[in-house]
A protein has these predicted regions:
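Polytopic transmembrane helical bundles with strong interfacial aromatic enrichment
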Residues: 1-139
Length: 139
């Protein structure tokens, strides 16, 4: 399970980094191609992290969450669930942003708003994940 957790982490870091950079470029640069490319990387990394996370979730639920996290640190369990909800909100927004930029629609304000909201959700999810990780770690 350890390699898949590391892969999940690396993909999440790429997703957050690309998401934040796409938001920065959406606000500061008229270069839609770069923003579109970064938004595509963020979407691809988020989807890959989601798939890897879904594959490791059953083991996490049995070995960590039910085994002791829910009893010892219920606040960490709630933070994990909140992180998952933020990611679930960010994914369709990332897809919409990528599609909007890909279609080259003349809606820069919408693209900027989507990029910023998506980046905020991804960063918040990453901070929640880091908080949960400090509570339980991995054996």
């Amino acid at each position: 399970m350890r390699w898949s957790v590391v892969l999940h982490l690396v993909l999440a870091v790429v997703a957050v980094g690309a998401g934040v950079h796409s938001a920065v470029f959406a606000w500061r640069s008229p270069d839609a191609a770069r923003t579109r490319r970064l938004a595509g990387w963020a979407l691809a990394a988020s989807l890959a992290a989601y798939v890897v996370g879904a594959l490791i979730y059953p083991a996490y639920k049995v070995e960590i969450r039910v085994a002791w996290l829910e009893q010892a640190h219920p606040e960490a369990t709630r933070a994990f669930d909140l992180k998952e909800q933020f990611v679930a909100l960010a994914l369709p927004m990332q897809l919409a942003l990528w599609w909007l930029l890909r279609a080259r629609a003349a809606r820069p304000a919408l693209a900027r708003g989507l990029a910023l909201a998506t980046a905020a959700l991804l960063v918040t999810a990453a901070l929640l994940a880091a908080g949960v990780e400090t509570v339980h770690g991995h054996p």
